Protein backbone atom coordinates (compact mmCIF):
# COMPACT_ATOMS: atom_id res chain seq x y z
CA UNK A 1 0.00 0.00 0.00
CA UNK A 2 1.34 3.42 -0.96
CA UNK A 3 0.24 6.96 -0.14
CA UNK A 4 1.13 10.00 -2.22
CA UNK A 5 0.05 13.47 -1.14
CA UNK A 6 1.08 16.50 -3.17
CA UNK A 7 0.22 20.19 -3.21
CA UNK A 8 1.67 22.44 -5.92
CA UNK A 9 1.36 26.21 -6.18
CA UNK A 10 4.12 27.51 -8.42
CA UNK A 11 4.26 30.78 -10.30
CA UNK A 12 6.80 33.10 -11.84
CA UNK A 13 6.70 36.88 -12.01
CA UNK A 14 9.34 38.78 -13.96
CA UNK A 15 9.78 42.27 -12.55
CA UNK A 16 12.31 44.99 -13.35
CA UNK A 17 12.49 48.69 -12.42
CA UNK A 18 8.85 49.08 -11.58
CA UNK A 19 7.22 47.10 -14.38
CA UNK A 20 6.40 43.47 -14.87
CA UNK A 21 6.60 41.33 -17.98
CA UNK A 22 4.83 40.31 -20.04
CA UNK A 23 3.17 43.74 -20.31
CA UNK A 24 0.74 45.52 -22.57
CA UNK A 25 2.62 48.47 -24.06
CA UNK A 26 1.04 51.90 -23.63
CA UNK A 27 1.83 55.40 -24.78
CA UNK A 28 4.89 56.77 -22.94
CA UNK A 29 3.89 59.05 -20.07
CA UNK A 30 0.52 57.39 -19.45
CA UNK A 31 -0.33 55.10 -16.56
CA UNK A 32 -0.34 51.40 -17.37
CA UNK A 33 -3.38 50.08 -15.51
CA UNK A 34 -3.23 46.59 -17.03
CA UNK A 35 -3.63 43.59 -14.74
CA UNK A 36 -0.52 42.00 -13.31
CA UNK A 37 0.30 38.98 -15.46
CA UNK A 38 2.38 36.04 -14.31
CA UNK A 39 4.78 34.38 -16.71
CA UNK A 40 3.21 31.07 -15.73
CA UNK A 41 1.18 29.56 -12.93
CA UNK A 42 0.95 25.88 -12.00
CA UNK A 43 -1.42 24.66 -9.30
CA UNK A 44 -2.47 21.17 -8.35
CA UNK A 45 -3.66 19.14 -5.39
CA UNK A 46 -3.28 15.36 -5.42
CA UNK A 47 -3.87 12.63 -2.89
CA UNK A 48 -3.83 8.95 -3.87
CA UNK A 49 -3.48 5.64 -2.00
CA UNK A 50 -2.67 3.04 -4.65
CA UNK A 51 -1.74 -0.60 -4.12
CA UNK A 52 1.18 -2.27 -5.87
CA UNK A 53 1.58 -6.05 -6.11
CA UNK A 54 4.76 -7.67 -7.40
CA UNK A 55 6.43 -11.05 -7.63
CA UNK A 56 9.08 -12.95 -9.50
CA UNK A 57 10.22 -16.44 -10.42
CA UNK A 58 13.73 -17.54 -11.31
CA UNK A 59 15.38 -20.65 -12.73
CA UNK A 60 19.12 -21.37 -12.61
CA UNK A 61 21.02 -24.37 -13.91
CA UNK A 62 24.66 -25.36 -14.47
CA UNK A 63 25.69 -28.28 -16.63
CA UNK A 64 28.30 -29.55 -19.07
CA UNK A 65 27.80 -29.69 -22.82
CA UNK A 66 30.64 -31.96 -23.78
CA UNK A 67 33.69 -30.18 -22.38
CA UNK A 68 31.94 -26.79 -22.28
CA UNK A 69 30.54 -25.57 -19.00
CA UNK A 70 27.11 -23.93 -19.41
CA UNK A 71 25.26 -21.52 -17.09
CA UNK A 72 21.58 -20.69 -17.59
CA UNK A 73 19.57 -18.12 -15.65
CA UNK A 74 16.02 -17.27 -16.63
CA UNK A 75 13.23 -15.54 -14.86
CA UNK A 76 10.14 -13.41 -15.01
CA UNK A 77 9.03 -10.48 -12.88
CA UNK A 78 5.43 -9.25 -12.76
CA UNK A 79 3.64 -6.42 -11.01
CA UNK A 80 0.29 -4.64 -10.94
CA UNK A 81 -0.40 -1.05 -9.89
CA UNK A 82 -4.02 -0.06 -9.43
CA UNK A 83 -3.34 3.69 -9.84
CA UNK A 84 -3.12 3.30 -13.61
CA UNK A 85 -4.54 -0.26 -13.66
CA UNK A 86 -1.38 -1.53 -15.36
CA UNK A 87 -0.02 -5.06 -15.22
CA UNK A 88 3.52 -5.60 -16.49
CA UNK A 89 5.31 -8.88 -17.17
CA UNK A 90 9.07 -8.72 -17.61
CA UNK A 91 10.84 -11.87 -18.86
CA UNK A 92 14.64 -12.01 -18.99
CA UNK A 93 17.34 -14.65 -19.49
CA UNK A 94 21.11 -15.05 -19.44
CA UNK A 95 23.11 -17.78 -21.16
CA UNK A 96 26.85 -18.22 -20.49
CA UNK A 97 29.45 -20.71 -21.67
CA UNK A 98 32.97 -21.40 -20.42
CA UNK A 99 34.93 -23.35 -23.06
CA UNK A 100 37.61 -25.85 -22.06
CA UNK A 101 40.43 -23.75 -23.47
CA UNK A 102 43.90 -22.96 -22.25
CA UNK A 103 42.70 -19.36 -22.02
CA UNK A 104 40.25 -18.68 -19.17
CA UNK A 105 37.27 -17.12 -20.97
CA UNK A 106 33.58 -16.76 -20.22
CA UNK A 107 31.08 -15.69 -22.91
CA UNK A 108 27.65 -14.36 -21.97
CA UNK A 109 24.53 -13.24 -23.78
CA UNK A 110 21.60 -11.74 -21.93
CA UNK A 111 18.36 -10.14 -22.94
CA UNK A 112 14.86 -9.39 -21.90
CA UNK A 113 12.06 -6.89 -21.59
CA UNK A 114 12.46 -4.46 -18.73
CA UNK A 115 9.98 -1.95 -17.31
CA UNK A 116 10.52 1.10 -15.14
CA UNK A 117 7.31 1.74 -13.29
CA UNK A 118 6.41 5.42 -12.85
CA UNK A 119 6.22 6.94 -9.41
CA UNK A 120 5.70 10.38 -7.87
CA UNK A 121 7.86 12.50 -10.18
CA UNK A 122 6.97 10.66 -13.38
CA UNK A 123 3.18 10.62 -12.92
CA UNK A 124 3.01 14.37 -12.20
CA UNK A 125 2.45 16.34 -15.40
CA UNK A 126 3.43 19.92 -16.13
CA UNK A 127 -0.01 21.14 -15.07
CA UNK A 128 0.64 19.88 -11.53
CA UNK A 129 -1.80 16.95 -11.72
CA UNK A 130 -1.24 13.20 -11.41
CA UNK A 131 -1.78 11.42 -14.74
CA UNK A 132 -3.64 8.16 -14.12
CA UNK A 133 -3.14 7.12 -17.76
CA UNK A 134 0.66 7.08 -17.49
CA UNK A 135 2.37 3.79 -18.43
CA UNK A 136 5.66 2.17 -17.48
CA UNK A 137 8.69 2.98 -19.59
CA UNK A 138 9.84 -0.12 -21.48
CA UNK A 139 13.20 -1.33 -22.75
CA UNK A 140 13.89 -4.37 -24.93
CA UNK A 141 17.60 -5.07 -24.75
CA UNK A 142 20.35 -7.52 -25.55
CA UNK A 143 23.83 -7.62 -23.99
CA UNK A 144 26.93 -9.50 -25.20
CA UNK A 145 29.89 -9.77 -22.84
CA UNK A 146 33.18 -11.56 -22.35
CA UNK A 147 35.36 -12.14 -19.26
CA UNK A 148 39.01 -12.99 -19.93
CA UNK A 149 41.26 -13.88 -17.00
CA UNK A 150 44.97 -14.16 -17.69
CA UNK A 151 48.42 -13.63 -16.23
CA UNK A 152 50.84 -10.98 -17.44
CA UNK A 153 54.35 -10.50 -16.02
CA UNK A 154 53.35 -13.29 -13.63
CA UNK A 155 50.48 -11.27 -12.14
CA UNK A 156 46.68 -11.84 -12.40
CA UNK A 157 44.52 -9.68 -14.67
CA UNK A 158 40.91 -9.70 -15.80
CA UNK A 159 39.54 -8.02 -18.94
CA UNK A 160 35.78 -7.53 -19.14
CA UNK A 161 34.14 -6.27 -22.33
CA UNK A 162 30.47 -5.65 -22.99
CA UNK A 163 28.35 -4.46 -25.90
CA UNK A 164 24.64 -3.70 -25.66
CA UNK A 165 21.65 -2.36 -27.55
CA UNK A 166 18.37 -1.13 -26.07
CA UNK A 167 15.14 -0.29 -27.85
CA UNK A 168 12.95 1.90 -25.65
CA UNK A 169 9.37 3.10 -25.88
CA UNK A 170 6.75 4.76 -23.67
CA UNK A 171 9.50 7.09 -22.50
CA UNK A 172 8.65 10.08 -20.32
CA UNK A 173 10.70 13.14 -21.40
CA UNK A 174 12.07 15.40 -18.71
CA UNK A 175 13.44 18.92 -18.45
CA UNK A 176 16.48 20.23 -16.57
CA UNK A 177 16.87 23.62 -14.94
CA UNK A 178 20.05 23.81 -12.87
CA UNK A 179 19.86 20.45 -11.04
CA UNK A 180 16.06 20.37 -10.98
CA UNK A 181 14.32 17.66 -13.00
CA UNK A 182 10.70 17.90 -14.08
CA UNK A 183 9.02 15.14 -16.08
CA UNK A 184 6.45 15.81 -18.76
CA UNK A 185 4.03 13.31 -17.19
CA UNK A 186 3.28 11.82 -20.63
CA UNK A 187 4.52 8.75 -22.55
CA UNK A 188 5.23 10.84 -25.62
CA UNK A 189 8.72 9.66 -26.52
CA UNK A 190 10.63 6.63 -27.76
CA UNK A 191 14.32 5.99 -28.18
CA UNK A 192 17.27 3.66 -28.36
CA UNK A 193 20.71 3.24 -26.81
CA UNK A 194 23.87 1.36 -27.69
CA UNK A 195 27.35 1.18 -26.27
CA UNK A 196 30.60 -0.67 -25.65
CA UNK A 197 32.39 -0.95 -22.29
CA UNK A 198 35.84 -2.36 -21.49
CA UNK A 199 37.53 -2.71 -18.11
CA UNK A 200 40.97 -4.10 -17.25
CA UNK A 201 41.45 -5.07 -13.61
CA UNK A 202 44.62 -6.46 -12.08
CA UNK A 203 47.89 -6.03 -10.26
CA UNK A 204 49.76 -3.41 -12.26
CA UNK A 205 52.01 -3.29 -9.18
CA UNK A 206 52.51 -6.61 -7.30
CA UNK A 207 50.14 -7.03 -4.37
CA UNK A 208 47.77 -4.09 -5.00
CA UNK A 209 44.81 -3.85 -7.36
CA UNK A 210 44.32 -1.20 -10.05
CA UNK A 211 42.00 -0.83 -13.02
CA UNK A 212 41.46 1.01 -16.30
CA UNK A 213 38.09 1.41 -18.02
CA UNK A 214 36.82 3.00 -21.21
CA UNK A 215 33.33 3.22 -22.69
CA UNK A 216 31.45 4.70 -25.60
CA UNK A 217 27.67 4.97 -25.61
CA UNK A 218 24.88 6.96 -27.23
CA UNK A 219 21.29 7.47 -26.09
CA UNK A 220 18.66 9.04 -28.37
CA UNK A 221 14.98 9.84 -28.07
CA UNK A 222 12.21 10.93 -30.43
CA UNK A 223 9.61 13.20 -28.80
CA UNK A 224 6.21 13.33 -30.49
CA UNK A 225 7.72 12.02 -33.75
CA UNK A 226 9.80 15.17 -34.32
CA UNK A 227 13.07 13.29 -34.88
CA UNK A 228 15.88 11.76 -32.84
CA UNK A 229 17.93 13.93 -30.49
CA UNK A 230 20.34 12.98 -27.66
CA UNK A 231 18.70 12.29 -24.30
CA UNK A 232 19.95 14.23 -21.27
CA UNK A 233 21.77 11.03 -20.20
CA UNK A 234 23.70 10.67 -23.50
CA UNK A 235 27.24 9.90 -22.19
CA UNK A 236 29.36 9.43 -25.34
CA UNK A 237 33.02 8.71 -24.43
CA UNK A 238 34.38 8.11 -20.92
CA UNK A 239 37.80 7.03 -19.66
CA UNK A 240 38.82 6.41 -16.06
CA UNK A 241 41.75 4.86 -14.25
CA UNK A 242 42.55 3.89 -10.67
CA UNK A 243 46.23 3.19 -9.99
CA UNK A 244 47.87 2.12 -6.72
CA UNK A 245 51.53 1.90 -5.80
CA UNK A 246 53.60 1.59 -2.63
CA UNK A 247 57.12 2.25 -1.39
CA UNK A 248 59.27 -0.90 -1.81
CA UNK A 249 60.98 -0.43 1.56
CA UNK A 250 57.73 0.61 3.28
CA UNK A 251 54.91 -1.40 1.62
CA UNK A 252 52.38 -0.17 4.19
CA UNK A 253 52.71 3.34 2.69
CA UNK A 254 50.50 3.48 -0.39
CA UNK A 255 49.61 6.12 -2.94
CA UNK A 256 46.66 6.02 -5.34
CA UNK A 257 45.77 8.09 -8.37
CA UNK A 258 42.32 8.36 -9.96
CA UNK A 259 41.91 9.91 -13.41
CA UNK A 260 38.56 10.64 -15.06
CA UNK A 261 37.75 12.12 -18.44
CA UNK A 262 34.26 12.21 -19.94
CA UNK A 263 32.58 14.03 -22.77
CA UNK A 264 30.09 16.59 -21.55
CA UNK A 265 26.48 15.53 -21.16
CA UNK A 266 23.72 17.39 -23.00
CA UNK A 267 23.05 20.66 -21.21
CA UNK A 268 19.40 19.80 -20.77
CA UNK A 269 16.31 21.71 -21.77
CA UNK A 270 14.84 24.65 -19.85
CA UNK A 271 11.35 24.24 -18.46
CA UNK A 272 9.63 26.30 -21.11
CA UNK A 273 5.97 27.13 -20.45
CA UNK A 274 3.59 29.64 -21.95
CA UNK A 275 1.61 32.16 -19.90
CA UNK A 276 -1.04 29.52 -19.24
CA UNK A 277 1.55 27.12 -17.84
CA UNK A 278 1.38 24.80 -20.85
CA UNK A 279 4.63 22.99 -21.74
CA UNK A 280 6.56 23.74 -24.91
CA UNK A 281 7.54 20.35 -26.34
CA UNK A 282 9.52 22.05 -29.11
CA UNK A 283 12.09 23.29 -26.58
CA UNK A 284 14.29 20.14 -26.52
CA UNK A 285 14.91 20.59 -30.25
CA UNK A 286 15.90 24.25 -29.82
CA UNK A 287 18.48 23.78 -27.06
CA UNK A 288 20.84 21.10 -28.35
CA UNK A 289 24.06 21.93 -26.53
CA UNK A 290 26.53 19.92 -24.49
CA UNK A 291 28.33 20.75 -21.27
CA UNK A 292 32.14 21.06 -21.31
CA UNK A 293 34.11 17.83 -20.91
CA UNK A 294 34.52 16.54 -17.36
CA UNK A 295 38.14 16.23 -16.18
CA UNK A 296 39.30 15.30 -12.70
CA UNK A 297 42.38 13.95 -10.91
CA UNK A 298 42.27 12.64 -7.32
CA UNK A 299 45.38 11.77 -5.32
CA UNK A 300 45.47 9.75 -2.12
CA UNK A 301 48.15 8.73 0.37
CA UNK A 302 47.49 6.09 3.01
CA UNK A 303 49.31 4.25 5.77
CA UNK A 304 48.23 0.70 6.68
CA UNK A 305 48.79 0.14 10.39
CA UNK A 306 46.96 -3.16 10.77
CA UNK A 307 45.81 -5.81 8.30
CA UNK A 308 45.54 -9.60 8.15
CA UNK A 309 48.76 -10.05 6.16
CA UNK A 310 52.07 -8.37 6.97
CA UNK A 311 50.77 -5.97 9.64
CA UNK A 312 48.79 -8.33 11.84
CA UNK A 313 48.63 -7.48 15.57
CA UNK A 314 47.88 -10.06 18.26
CA UNK A 315 46.81 -9.18 21.80
CA UNK A 316 46.34 -5.86 23.55
CA UNK A 317 44.00 -3.05 22.55
CA UNK A 318 45.16 -3.00 18.92
CA UNK A 319 44.53 -6.73 18.66
CA UNK A 320 40.80 -5.92 18.48
CA UNK A 321 41.32 -4.43 15.01
CA UNK A 322 41.44 -6.55 11.88
CA UNK A 323 42.22 -3.53 9.69
CA UNK A 324 43.31 0.03 10.46
CA UNK A 325 44.27 2.54 7.77
CA UNK A 326 44.77 6.31 7.89
CA UNK A 327 44.59 8.22 4.62
CA UNK A 328 44.82 11.75 3.21
CA UNK A 329 43.08 12.57 -0.08
CA UNK A 330 43.17 15.51 -2.47
CA UNK A 331 40.05 15.61 -4.60
CA UNK A 332 40.21 17.52 -7.89
CA UNK A 333 43.93 18.03 -7.31
CA UNK A 334 44.38 20.41 -10.26
CA UNK A 335 41.35 22.52 -9.25
CA UNK A 336 39.64 22.02 -12.62
CA UNK A 337 36.38 23.94 -12.98
CA UNK A 338 33.82 21.35 -14.08
CA UNK A 339 30.21 22.13 -14.99
CA UNK A 340 27.39 20.00 -13.57
CA UNK A 341 24.42 21.78 -15.19
CA UNK A 342 23.09 25.04 -16.56
CA UNK A 343 20.81 27.56 -14.94
CA UNK A 344 18.55 29.05 -17.59
CA UNK A 345 17.99 32.81 -17.71
CA UNK A 346 15.04 33.96 -19.80
CA UNK A 347 15.25 36.99 -22.12
CA UNK A 348 11.81 38.58 -21.88
CA UNK A 349 12.17 40.42 -25.19
CA UNK A 350 12.97 37.31 -27.28
CA UNK A 351 11.72 34.59 -24.90
CA UNK A 352 15.05 32.83 -25.46
CA UNK A 353 16.75 31.07 -22.52
CA UNK A 354 20.47 31.63 -22.02
CA UNK A 355 22.55 29.03 -20.14
CA UNK A 356 24.61 30.05 -17.10
CA UNK A 357 26.96 27.24 -16.00
CA UNK A 358 26.71 25.77 -12.51
CA UNK A 359 30.16 24.72 -11.34
CA UNK A 360 31.17 21.75 -9.23
CA UNK A 361 33.39 21.95 -6.16
CA UNK A 362 37.05 22.79 -6.79
CA UNK A 363 40.02 21.29 -5.01
CA UNK A 364 39.44 20.07 -1.47
CA UNK A 365 41.19 17.88 1.08
CA UNK A 366 39.92 14.94 3.08
CA UNK A 367 41.30 12.85 5.96
CA UNK A 368 39.95 9.33 6.30
CA UNK A 369 40.30 6.65 8.97
CA UNK A 370 39.18 3.14 8.01
CA UNK A 371 39.00 0.31 10.51
CA UNK A 372 37.45 -3.12 10.77
CA UNK A 373 36.86 -4.94 14.04
Where do the PLM segments sit?
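Transmembrane beta-barrel strands of outer-membrane/channel proteins
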Residues: 1-2, 74-78, 93-95, 109-113, ...
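C-terminal beta-signal and adjacent terminal beta-strands/loops
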Residues: 210, 260-278, 303-373
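Outer-membrane beta-barrel transmembrane domain signature of Gram-negative proteins
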Residues: 1-69, 188-195
Amino acid sequence: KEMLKDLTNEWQLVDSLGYSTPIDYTTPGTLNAADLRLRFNIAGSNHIQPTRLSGYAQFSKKFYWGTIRVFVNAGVRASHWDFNDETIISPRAQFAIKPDWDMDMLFKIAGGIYYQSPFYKEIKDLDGNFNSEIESQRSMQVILSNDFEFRMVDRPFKLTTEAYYKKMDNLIPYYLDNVRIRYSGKNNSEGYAYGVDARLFGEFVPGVDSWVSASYARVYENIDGKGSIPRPTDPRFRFSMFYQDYMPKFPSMRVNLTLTYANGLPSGTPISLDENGKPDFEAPYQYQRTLPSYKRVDIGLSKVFIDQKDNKVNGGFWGNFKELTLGVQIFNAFNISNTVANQWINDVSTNYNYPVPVRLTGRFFNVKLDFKL
